Amino acid sequence: MKNTLRNILLGGLVVAMTASCELNLIPTTDITYEEGTPLLLTERDIAEFQNGVIASYRGLHYGSYYQTVEVMTECFNATIDFGNNYGFVHKLGSGFLASDDYTTGIWQNHYGAIKNYNIALEQCEMVTDEELLPDTDLLKGITLFCRASSYLTLARHFSADYDPATAATELSVPLILVYDQLHKPVRATLQEVYDQIIT
């Protein structure tokens, strides 16, 4: 009995000591983004930004981003062992709503990638070293393509079909061309979105 009581007391002390430790430590090795600070200082920086842009783009072009659309539009017929995978999408039932994970994932992840693209484009404009300009121009071109691709996907999924007669008044998705955490974007017209995609 004495040993049990002593073990409980020691266990309580260990828990109390652990809980009183300072666990809210601030990391000192992270890189924080400060607006206006140049990040593209070497060829390696540009190559790493380019890898990040391409990784963001590649991450948006597989899996549920495309399977959902395929299941909806290609009239796939479920077999007996399909396990109700993409069930609501397959039958377009009342459970498939705008708040469905397949829908919100497309919206969230494309805008997350657009944020990365906008930061990369902002950084490209800050490069003044003549030796880095060719690599910077390549990064800028890749990033503009990736951002246009994301806007095209968003416009196709969350807007009406493009009709030249109504494009100037039909609302589409928000156009965010500069990274600003505090900005509350409004929906742009379909014409504005497609003009941005083309340019």
Task: Tell where the protein language model's regions lie, with residue ranges.
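Membrane-proximal, proline-rich intrinsically disordered regions
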Residues: 21-70
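A structural signal for short, hydrophobic/glycine-enriched beta-strand patches
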Residues: 39, 43-44, 57-59, 63, ...
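Solvent-exposed, polar/charged alpha-helical surfaces in well-ordered, non-transmembrane soluble domains
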Residues: 51, 55, 115-122, 195
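Short coil/linker segments at helix-helix boundaries
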Residues: 134, 157-196
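Short, helix-capping/interhelical loops that line the mouth of catalytic, cofactor-
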Residues: 34-35, 82-102, 169-188
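Sec-dependent bacterial lipoprotein signal peptides
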Residues: 1-19
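Secretory-pathway/luminal and periplasmic proteins that interact with or process carbohydrate-rich
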Residues: 58-63, 78, 150-161
